[in-house]
Amino acid sequence: MSPEELKQLELLRNRFAQLTSNLGSLRTSVSNSNPLPTYESLQASVNILQANIRSIQDIATENAGLFQRLAIHPSTNFPGRTQEHILTQLLRKKLEPNVESWVEEARATARGVGVDASKLAGGVHRRGEHDYDDEGTYGMDEDGDDAPQDPFSEQWADMLDNFQQTLQQYVTVQVKKKYTAEERAAGIENVRTGLRQTLEESEDDDEDEEEEEEDEEEDEAAAAAGNAGGLATGAGGSAAAGGGMFGAIEPEHIFYLQAQGNLQLPGNVPIESKRIQTVPTRRVAPPR
């Protein structure tokens, strides 16, 4: 091996060690934290792991030829007796049973959707062999028919179209409905919403309710303006005479008008000027 090839192998080893350390740190954080880590913390850990995996993939892609022709042989000073399990793991030529089952399941899934599984066993792609160039433009080449195609490209395109159609259907139709299709099939009168008011599905009723709310807001605004005008013009006459609907205007009326836009005080609001003043009784001093 040349020094440059040894450097690439050492770089890949460091990346795997860093990935293992980050996975162990995340596992410890989730297991020992009470409460669990925040969403932002978990997302940051996931981003770090994705960056590590992407770095390993880039190194493996660039040095695919080197890693395919390398043969591992333990040195004479390796402690094979005490570290036999590590040596067996490093020299293993076949996949582990659980990994082998995952691979077979993935191949069966690929065959089920019409993908040739033999195309998926071609090893790691070299840079430039995909249907996108080094500038990151994907599927923009004019002579894309001559380039080798990703066997999953059609499946990803179908999933993207299906997702976009489902999302458009949900945003334009389903999100405006108050009941699901299952609830409508079973009868909306049997739906337990936890609300006391009657919910109807008619769009005309929704428009009528919006118009009624707008009318009520206009009436309240007009009433508030009329009350404010009556306060400005009749405070000197009606209030001074002690007559009128509200009688004398008290500070409580002003505060309630400012807060609610109405001079009609509720019955439970006390008026300070009408509170009965109790004179404290004086205790007579005993004779000396």
Curated annotation (Swiss-Prot):
Name of the gene this protein is made from: MED8
Coiled-coil segments:
4-58, 180-228
Q: What is its main location?
A: nucleus
Its Gene Ontology biological processes? regulation of transcription by RNA polymerase II
InterPro entries assigned to the protein according to its UniProt record, in alphabetical order:
Mediatior_Med8_fun/met
Give any Gene Ontology cellular component: mediator complex
Superkingdom as given in the UniProt entry: Eukaryota
Per UniProt, what is one Pfam family of this protein?
Med8
Q: Where is this region: Disordered?
A: 122-150, 191-245, 266-288
Keywords carried by this UniProt record: Activator, Coiled coil, Nucleus, Transcription, Transcription regulation
Enumerate composition-biased segments (Gly residues). 227-245
Provide the protein name: Mediator of RNA polymerase II transcription subunit 8
Query: Where, by residue number, does the polypeptide cross the bilayer?
Result: none
Which organism does this record belong to?
Chaetomium globosum (strain ATCC 6205 / CBS 148.51 / DSM 1962 / NBRC 6347 / NRRL 1970)
* One Gene Ontology MF term: transcription coregulator activity
Report the locations given in the UniProt record. Nucleus
